């Protein structure tokens, strides 16, 4: 009797790593695969993954950036300890394939899998490869990337996104008969973005009754953002800390003003929604490069944070009537790789058969 194939997913830290991993896990679960997760106990995967019916094991590992000299000297011992922890879990569960989706956990987990003779599939979500994935790419059986350029000559498969997002109606259907104020969705990620929380209330005041706004302010920023809107405008608006049903929010929106993390960019493309991106400023310009493809194909605009002003953003939005926004939405959907979960799953299955 053949036992079910087994996949160990290594992902942690942020939704940009965890949610694509969950999308692939769900796809393979539907095909009878057993899934287990490797993460850290103090990050979001510890709560989120079990809610999806997936068992999770934890190793102790943290990033090295910004650490003091004493901690840096102790780091090699901690990394070896984390590798040994991961190898113990791998030996006990015996996965057929290990999938690394990024985060600190992927480093020790990937090395442990390689030492155990288990094939490692890497998936890089961003247009600039993270340090962990750069190292692991040397020992991985297969390296995949969401956007071209993270690795030279590696397969571009897109970012796996949630099925409720890929299942949304087409932009043409959603925009048909839509009237009234332009619907602006503001998203700064689960932690919010202070610059957007400060700027959008002023933008609302400048645009007046031309717009209505749904604003995700992020944890701990609800009250101050709501007060900023009350001070600036009487434009219809809704401010929430989080948006639980992001697919419904995308379906509602005419345009999204947001950061350009890898998952956000991929979800907007899959949903078919135009965007104005305000990338997080980072020395490697990771978020700006994530957004570049949608900007180039006419699905999005980009304003660097240093150039962002309420007046400038209001002027940009004022030029985007609903017909233009529909064209941007159509371009976004046409640029999407909506079967990224299938593509990653197919690679995993091919390695499991060897």
UniProtKB/Swiss-Prot annotation:
The membrane-topology field of this record reads: Peripheral membrane protein
Q: What Pfam families does the entry give? A: Glyco_tran_28_C (PF04101), Glyco_transf_28 (PF03033)
Origin organism lineage:
Bacteria, Pseudomonadati, Pseudomonadota, Gammaproteobacteria, Vibrionales
One GO CC annotation: plasma membrane
Q: Does the keyword Nucleotidyltransferase apply?
A: no
Q: Which CDD domains match?
A: GT28_MurG
| UniProt GO MF annotations | UDP-N-acetyl-D-glucosamine:N-acetylmuramoyl-L-alanyl-D-glutamyl-meso-2,6-diaminopimelyl-D-alanyl-D-alanine-diphosphoundecaprenol 4-beta-N-acetylglucosaminlytransferase activity; undecaprenyldiphospho-muramoylpentapeptide beta-N-acetylglucosaminyltransferase activity
Family annotation (HAMAP family): MurG (MF_00033)
Protein name, as recorded: UDP-N-acetylglucosamine--N-acetylmuramyl-(pentapeptide) pyrophosphoryl-undecaprenol N-acetylglucosamine transferase
EC class, as a word, reads transferase
């Amino acid at each position: 009797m053949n036992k079910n194939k087994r996949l160990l997913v290594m992902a942690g830290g942020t939704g940009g790593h965890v949610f694509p991993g969950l999308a692939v896990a769900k796809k393979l679960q539907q095909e009878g695969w057993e899934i287990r997760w490797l993460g850290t106990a103090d990050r979001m995967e510890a709560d989120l993954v079990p809610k999806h019916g997936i068992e999770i094991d934890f190793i102790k590992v943290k990033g090295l950036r910004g650490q003091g000299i004493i901690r840096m000297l102790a780091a090699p011992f901690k990394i070896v300890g984390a590798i040994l922890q991961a190898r113990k879990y791998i030996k006990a569960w015996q996965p057929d394939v290990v999938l690394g989706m990024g985060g600190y956990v992927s480093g020790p987990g990937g090395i442990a899998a390689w030492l155990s003779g288990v094939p490692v599939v890497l998936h890089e979500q961003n247009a600039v490869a993270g340090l962990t994935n750069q190292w692991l790419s040397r020992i991985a059986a297969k390296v995949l990337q969401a956007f071209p350029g993270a690795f030279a000559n590696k397969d571009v498969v897109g970012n796996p996104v949630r099925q409720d997002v890929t299942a949304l109606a087409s932009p043409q259907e959603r925009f048909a008969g839509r009237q009234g104020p332009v619907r602006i969705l503001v998203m700064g990620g689960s932690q919010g973005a202070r610059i957007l929380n400060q700027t959008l209330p002023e933008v609302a005041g400048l645009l007046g009754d031309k717009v209505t706004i749904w604003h995700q302010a992020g944890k701990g920023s609800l009250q101050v953002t709501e007060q900023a809107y009350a001070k600036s405008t009487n434009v219809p608006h809704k401010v929430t800390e989080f948006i639980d049903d992001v697919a419904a929010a995308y379906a509602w929106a005419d345009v999204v003003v947001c950061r350009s993390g890898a998952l956000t960019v991929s979800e907007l493309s899959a949903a078919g929604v135009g965007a104005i991106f305000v990338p997080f400023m980072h020395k490697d310009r990771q978020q700006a490069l994530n957004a570049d493809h949608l900007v180039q194909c006419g699905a999005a605009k980009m304003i660097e944070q240093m150039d962002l002003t309420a007046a400038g953003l209001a002027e940009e939005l004022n030029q985007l009537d609903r017909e233009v926004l529909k064209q941007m939405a159509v371009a976004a959907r046409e640029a999407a790789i909506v079967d990224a979960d299938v593509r990653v799953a197919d690679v995993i299955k091919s390695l499991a058969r060897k």
